[in-house]
Amino acid sequence: MKPVTLYDVAEYAGVSYQTVSRVVNQASHVSAKTREKVEAAMAELNYIPNRVAQQLAGKQSLLIGVATSSLALHAPSQIVAAIKSRADQLGASVVVSMVERSGVEACKAAVHNLLAQRVSGLIINYPLDDQDAIAVEAACTNVPALFLDVSDQTPINSIIFSHEDGTRLGVEHLVALGHQQIALLAGPLSSVSARLRLAGWHKYLTRNQIQPIAEREGDWSAMSGFQQTMQMLNEGIVPTAMLVANDQMALGAMRAITESGLRVGADISVVGYDDTEDSSCYIPPLTTIKQDFRLLGQTSVDRLLQLSQGQAVKGNQLLPVSLVKRKTTLAPNTQTASPRALADSLMQLARQVSRLESGQ
């Protein structure tokens, strides 16, 4: 179907092309009656303004560019959705460029793509070390930029959740339940967020005189959580609890626990990180560290608008996190396993012994 043009709107409303253009670009010298007539025609014809063309014409509406990690991951997709929701409330538009490869050069390429579309400001949700973040900020030229996945020590404009509080809450929850045999499942250590969470866990476990019995590294995906946890269990390492760096990997870990004949919560407690929308629907529902992505989206758009107007205080802004207690964490050894669960566990042990005897 042929897209509706300004000429179509002008003909339908009985006005000139120039008049429709002035209405679309919110020019002041148009009568209220004429504006209403043109807007009614636009609504009737379902006319969609060309935002890039409006920018080229000098219209001062805000066009926000978002450079983001893969939207196949739950957290980045929810953050982008929250940014779009807030931008829509303010009458702004959003254009997204996904960073397809790893590394600072790929992030710069995404930024250059957005700058070519004449964005008014940039939100960068991609993990960057301090020097890389500074280099990306320099590539933004004179366009204000806000970073969402950097260290709170990076000397740039950023909004991040408190990794310190998030890791402390997870450790304190398990310690309060009585856990001592705790395994860690980190995200990819190329990610600053993954490293900060791992460091935080170590800090607060050490304060409680606990050494993790195992450390594994995933890639944020559920499959990596499954594979890393299954490998750990097959090696005979069975913790009473796991701290996992995001909810998707926690889902995979829960599958591995269940397929190994163990029970999530009763045998191995699991604490996730993020509180993505699906976490309450896991079986059992996941105990996790909540990062409020809706709040992050709203705050980042508001602050970027302030930065573009020279009003915002520059520097780092920390957002709060909280512990959401659900059904995947229990005190260790508080429930008696069912005969079926015991049988499954014995079969798993027999398989492990058989592999050892055969030299596999």
Swiss-Prot record:
Q: Where in the numbering of this chain does the HTH lacI-type domain appear?
A: 1-58
Q: What SUPFAM superfamilies does the annotation carry?
A: lambda repressor-like DNA-binding domains (SSF47413), Periplasmic binding protein-like I (SSF53822)
Please describe, based on the UniProt annotation, the reported consequence of changing Y282D: In T41 mutant
GO cellular component, alphabetical, reads: cytosol
BP terms from Gene Ontology: negative regulation of DNA-templated transcription; regulation of DNA-templated transcription
**Description of how the protein assembles with itself and partners:** Homotetramer.
Q: What is this protein called?
A: Lactose operon repressor
Q: InterPro entries under this entry?
A: HTH_LacI, LacI/GalR-like_sensor, Lambda_DNA-bd_dom_sf, Peripla_BP_I
Q: What does this protein do?
A: Repressor of the lactose operon. Binds allolactose as an inducer.
* MF annotations from Gene Ontology: cis-regulatory region sequence-specific DNA binding; DNA-binding transcription factor activity; DNA-binding transcription repressor activity; identical protein binding; transcription cis-regulatory region binding
Q: Which gene encodes it?
A: lacI
Q: Which UniProt keywords apply?
A: DNA-binding, Repressor, Transcription, Transcription regulation
Q: Which organism is it from?
A: Escherichia coli (strain K12)
Fill in the misc note. Answer: Removing residues 1-59 results in loss of DNA-binding activity but retains tetrameric structure and inducer-binding activity. Deleting residues 340-360 results in loss of tetramer formation, but retains dimer formation, inducer-binding activity, and DNA-binding activity (if residues 1-59 are present).
Q: Which residues bind DNA?
A: 6-25
